[in-house]
């Protein structure tokens, strides 16, 4: 497991940002996510934990996320946001949609919406409301996410965006239709930092967080 990265600047709010697959918290630092926040006077702390050691079944990762990160943070911060990149974004949406842990907002950079087998099945069924999953299929974290989105929890503020050339864009556009979004940001770029860093900067510039004196 890679070390957790933190930017603690006395913020009243916290954002837990989850790395994507094959990504470490250190990649997020190197890409400029932490320095972009440090350059703004937002009353926001940023923590990037590494949950990859929990394995492919995200039910364990979700339990760890709530027990070790979200629950302690709620005792310390006014508001706790959850976010992630790619697979990390999928885990963040799953945490909210599955009512695993209470969050005050979501920051989703190119959140992985599941394989085409699942998203195509939803489209063939005529939409999410008409689609159904069997008990065995619910062992798949991709399927569980969409099952939870059929009966979503109360809405929270959500920022979501992805690159216009992202190879997973079809699934993300479907996901965006089922999140409480005012709009989904689509920027030049692929499923990489060419899109993710500009999206992160847009999130920080439009975010609801207070400004430090």
Question: Language-model segments: which ranges?
Answer:
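Gly/Ala-rich beta-loop-alpha elbow adjacent to hydrolase catalytic centers
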Residues: 83-92
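Alpha/beta-hydrolase active-site loop signature
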Residues: 22, 50-55, 113, 191
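C-terminal catalytic histidine-bearing segment of alpha/beta-hydrolase fold enzymes
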Residues: 21, 57-58, 165-213
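Hydrolase active-site cap/lid region
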Residues: 96-138, 196-197
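Conserved alpha/beta-hydrolase
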Residues: 37-56
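The feature captures the conserved acid-bearing segment of alpha/beta-hydrolase catalytic domains
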Residues: 128-180
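Short, surface-exposed "cap/lid" segments of acyl-processing enzymes
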Residues: 1-41
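Alpha/beta-hydrolase active-site loop
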Residues: 56-75
């Amino acid at each position: 497991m890679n070390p957790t990265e933190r930017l603690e600047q006395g913020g009243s709010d916290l954002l837990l940002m989850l790395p994507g697959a094959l990504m470490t918290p250190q990649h997020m630092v190197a890409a400029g996510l932490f320095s972009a926040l440090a350059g703004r006077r937002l009353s926001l702390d940023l923590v990037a934990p590494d949950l990859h050691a929990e394995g492919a079944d995200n039910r364990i990762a979700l339990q760890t996320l709530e027990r070790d990160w979200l629950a302690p943070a709620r005792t310390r911060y006014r508001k706790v946001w959850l976010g992630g990149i790619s697979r990390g974004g999928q885990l963040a949406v799953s945490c909210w949609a599955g009512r695993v842990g209470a969050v005050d907002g979501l920051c989703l950079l190119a959140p992985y919406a599941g394989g085409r087998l699942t998203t195509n099945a939803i489209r063939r069924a005529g939409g999410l409301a008409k689609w159904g999953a069997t008990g065995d299929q619910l062992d798949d974290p991709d399927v569980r996410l969409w099952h939870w989105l059929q009966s979503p929890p109360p809405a929270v503020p959500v920022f979501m965006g992805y690159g216009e050339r992202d190879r997973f864009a079809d699934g993300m556009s479907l996901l965006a239709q089922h999140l409480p979004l005012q709009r989904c940001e689509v920027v030049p770029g692929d499923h990489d930092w060419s899109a993710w860093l500009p999206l992160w900067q847009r999130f920080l510039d439009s975010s609801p967080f207070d400004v430090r004196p």
